[in-house]
């Protein structure tokens, strides 16, 4: 059976003032996506009414639909196979290491992973920008509209900026630093969280966010994590609207203010991403644990989705 297995990373989007633009890929947690061409022992393709079948295991997999048109990865695979006239039966198996609804790009990891897998399995040789375009289509299932702020880092790795939506333009910057992520056991719907974001904002808030976002980009010139974190905490638009969705978030920010370079909500939450001072990692972990009693990840930034196994 011809197959390819992909490791696809968790991602953190927005990062304060970079709403729907900035994203980071993390080394941990991650999803594993296996895509196989289904054949009988004799080598003939298995006859089926469904060209694509999906199976799941892992984090909250029972809550994720496996119908192709309702599954983020299924939507991506179907569109790619239609566009490139791929007349094969495939099996998609997703091992969820990223909790759905976490604010860590769970759906994006599946979308990106299957896009990379289809590209590899059928030798399409698509550039990363095209893979992001396809992967972002799956995000419409999870968020109500296609958006690329999570799938871009899930494919490129490191730090990405979605500088234009149509036509899609992405800037990728390789960066190296460690983040500490807390995942409170709180349910937040991506769609509901997006609805909290104001449709119009005061010009002073726009000026603030543009300035702080520019400062963050400048800080990456020499990997200045202290400056990056400082500006990451100064979003005047989105974080204030969403902070109330996460119990004790404001109190935790106050407790760790001298222990981290920066802290903010990851994506639509509930995950919290922080940039701890190296000597303060254990203390910040303790505060997170005592407050939320939740999973905590201390991780470097990661590569984009990549092949871990391939069989002809």
UniProtKB/Swiss-Prot annotation:
GO terms for cellular component: cytoplasm. Signal peptide: none annotated. Pathway: Amino-acid biosynthesis; L-threonine biosynthesis; L-threonine from L-aspartate: step 4/5. GO terms for biological process: threonine biosynthetic process. Its EC number is 2.7.1.39. InterPro entries: GHMP_kinase_C_dom, GHMP_kinase_C_sf, GHMP_kinase_N_dom, GHMP_knse_ATP-bd_CS, Homoserine_kinase, Ribosomal_Su5_D2-typ_SF, Ribsml_uS5_D2-typ_fold_subgr. PROSITE patterns: GHMP_KINASES_ATP (PS00627). The keyword ATP-binding applies. Disulfide bonds: none annotated. Keywords: Amino-acid biosynthesis, ATP-binding, Cytoplasm, Kinase, Nucleotide-binding, Threonine biosynthesis, Transferase. ATP binds at residues 99-109. The keyword Transferase applies. GO terms for molecular function: ATP binding; homoserine kinase activity. It catalyses: L-homoserine + ATP = O-phospho-L-homoserine + ADP + H(+). It is found in: Cytoplasm. Belongs to the GHMP kinase family. Homoserine kinase subfamily. NCBIfam families: PRK01212.1-4, thrB. Catalyzes the ATP-dependent phosphorylation of L-homoserine to L-homoserine phosphate. This is Homoserine kinase.
């Amino acid at each position: 059976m011809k197959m390819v297995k992909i490791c696809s990373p968790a991602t953190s989007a927005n990062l304060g003032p970079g709403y729907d633009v900035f994203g980071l890929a993390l080394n941990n947690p991650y999803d594993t996506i296996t895509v196989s061409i289904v054949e009988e022992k004799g080598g003939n393709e298995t006859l089926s009414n469904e060209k694509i079948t999906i199976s799941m295991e892992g984090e909250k997999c029972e809550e994720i639909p496996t119908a192709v048109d309702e599954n983020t990865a299924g939507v991506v695979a179907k569109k790619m196979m239609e566009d490139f006239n791929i007349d094969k039966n495939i099996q998609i198996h997703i091992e969820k290491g990223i909790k759905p609804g976490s604010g860590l790009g769970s759906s994006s990891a599946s979308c990106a992973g299957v896009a990379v897998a289809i590209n590899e399995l059928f030798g399409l040789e698509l550039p990363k920008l095209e893979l992001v375009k396809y992967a972002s289509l799956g995000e419409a299932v999870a968020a109500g509209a296609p958006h690329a702020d999570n799938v871009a880092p899930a494919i490129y790795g490191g730090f990405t900026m979605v500088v234009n939506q149509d036509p899609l333009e992405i800037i990728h910057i390789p960066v190296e630093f460690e983040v500490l992520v807390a995942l409170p056991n709180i349910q937040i719907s991506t769609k509901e969280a997006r609805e909290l974001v104001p449709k119009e904002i005061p010009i002073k808030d726009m000026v603030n966010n543009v300035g702080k976002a520019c400062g963050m980009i400048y800080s990456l010139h020499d990997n200045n994590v202290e400056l990056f974190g400082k500006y990451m905490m100064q979003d005047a638009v989105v974080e204030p609207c969403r902070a109330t969705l996460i119990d004790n978030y404001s109190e935790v920010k106050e407790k760790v203010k001298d222990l981290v370079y920066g802290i903010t909500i990851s994506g639509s939450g509930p995950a919290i991403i922080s940039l701890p001072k190296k000597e303060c990692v254990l203390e910040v972990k303790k505060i997170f644990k005592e407050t939320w009693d939740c999973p905590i990840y201390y991780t470097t930034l990661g590569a984009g989705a990549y092949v871990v196994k391939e069989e002809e």
